[in-house]
Amino acid sequence: MKKKIYIAGCGGMLGEAFHKCFGSTYELKCTDIDVNETWLSYLDFRDYESYLRDVSEFKSDYLFHLGAYTDLEFCELNQDDTYATNTLAVENAVYISNKLNIPLLYISTAGIFDGAKDTFDDWDLPNPMGHYARSKYAGEIFVQNNVDRHLICRAGWMMGSGPKKDKKFVQKIMKQLKY
């Protein structure tokens, strides 16, 4: 019997990569607020009761929380939405992980560092610049302090999946060049 992974916020580039990577060896439930693939089902992970119910009914062995607003310009202009999604919703994942006694994987960002050095390691102190980085770092702190079994991964620049999923800087430039 395959182990089960519940992946919240799976509609972006990283989620698609996780689906491809883990789909053959694990039973997956992939959710997102933007159902843009046939293998996704709807979930707003900011809604604790819905999130808890969905993970519980799936009987997950692991909880992966990928979801976040990652468009830096959006995050700077929409601070309340950014913190509700990137910080407060992470608290939902923590509570669910603890309640169901399952490990939590939380995706953060290498952007929690200020760029003052060429390379950073695990012993460098974060100095997030901007609301996106601060909201993700606040999520990290909450996970570290409140879940025994957790893994925090700090992703860097991701590119790929084409214009449908890539909302980052490079794709924005490409879009502007087309006009």
Enumerate the predicted regions with their spans.
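Active-site helix of classical SDR
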Residues: 135
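NAD(P)-cofactor binding segment of oxidoreductase domains
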Residues: 77-105, 142
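NAD(P)-dependent short-chain dehydrogenase/reductase
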Residues: 141-179
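Rossmann-fold cofactor-recognition segment
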Residues: 33-49
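Active-site "gating" loop of Rossmann-like NAD(P)-dependent oxidoreductase/epimerase domains
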Residues: 69-72, 77, 107-130
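A hydrophobic alpha-helix adjacent to the NAD(P)-binding/active-site core of NAD(P)-dependent oxidoreductases
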Residues: 40, 82-85, 128, 132
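NAD(P)H-binding glycine-rich loop region in Rossmannoid oxidoreductase-like domains
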Residues: 45-85
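N-terminal Rossmann NAD(P)H-binding glycine-rich loop of SDR-like oxidoreductase domains
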Residues: 2-25
